Amino acid sequence: MVSYVNALLYGVGGIVVAGMALLVAFQDRLVYVPVLPGLTKSYPINPARLRLIYEDVWLRSSDGVKLHAWFIKLLPDCRGPTIMFFQENAGNIAHRLEMVRIMLQKLQCNVFMLSYRGYGASDGYPSQHGITMDAQAALDHLMQRTDIDTSQIIVFGRSLGGAVGAALTKNNPEKISALILENTFTSILDMAGVLLPFLKWVIGGSTAKGLKIMNFLVRSPWSTIDIIGQIKQPILFISGLQDEMVPPIHMKMLYAKAAAHNKQCYFVEFPSGMHMDTWLTGGDRYWRTIQHFMEQHVSGRKHDGSNSRSSDSQSS
């Protein structure tokens, strides 16, 4: 009996040690994927290929890292809303250009696309602290421009970009008009158990029931669930119910946490939407949803109408 217990303890200990080793060695490769398999770090195309009006922007983050971005304009003199688009964790901003091309047309806006450090033409290596500084540098750049209306800046983040955008929005309540989150996770701590199921017993976010004894090993927790309730600006939550990477329940949890503190929250589901293609499968309804949200809450586009925190208001 004693030998059986010892063997069990050794087995559990071995699993914990193996999990710790995997987490330390590979976590950054799971969270940040600047180069897709079979491709290079460089941009396969630029906005000119799609006949878009754009500017190469070079920035310095507060720690001196050189960053690259594209500022894409609807028209040379367009002073309408500017959307700061923060991408997912894999690939680079060039892989989002087709979606952005349609975004410009449907929403009649400008789009600022930042390459996180370590992505695309930006220097450095990605980390939560570093990317948070990168996003702030991008916003500071926009606020200094004289060719846009700085009262109409909207943050749009998908997946990892949602975590980046939520942090930026919370930290800049007077500069950002609204936030749009699409298929975003509650935290990397919660996603650890999704990617590696055995980790859910030892790693988890603030709402998890596990022991959380290995949370200290996670270098980029991106705990959006812990800050979403502090955001005062209007928030639109877009959830693809066929998301194969981030369980849709994460978006519902984020909405519930935000709506408990913010009456200007909206939750919209797209039954056919997967992690990366909700904008495509959602069709015209997807773009109408965002357009309506912007008309309600972005300076210069506001229409008369009552605000609502109910998911039913836009989820028809």
Predicted regions and their residues:
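Short beta-strand/loop motif that positions the catalytic acidic residue
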Residues: 230-232, 237-239, 243
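Mobile cap/lid helix-loop segments that gate and shape the active-site cleft of serine hydrolases
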Residues: 189-233, 292
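Alpha/beta-hydrolase-fold catalytic nucleophile elbow
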Residues: 115, 182-183, 270
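Primarily recognizes the serine-hydrolase "nucleophile elbow" in alpha/beta-hydrolase
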Residues: 141-147, 151-195
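C-terminal catalytic histidine-bearing segment of alpha/beta-hydrolase fold enzymes
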Residues: 252-256, 260-316
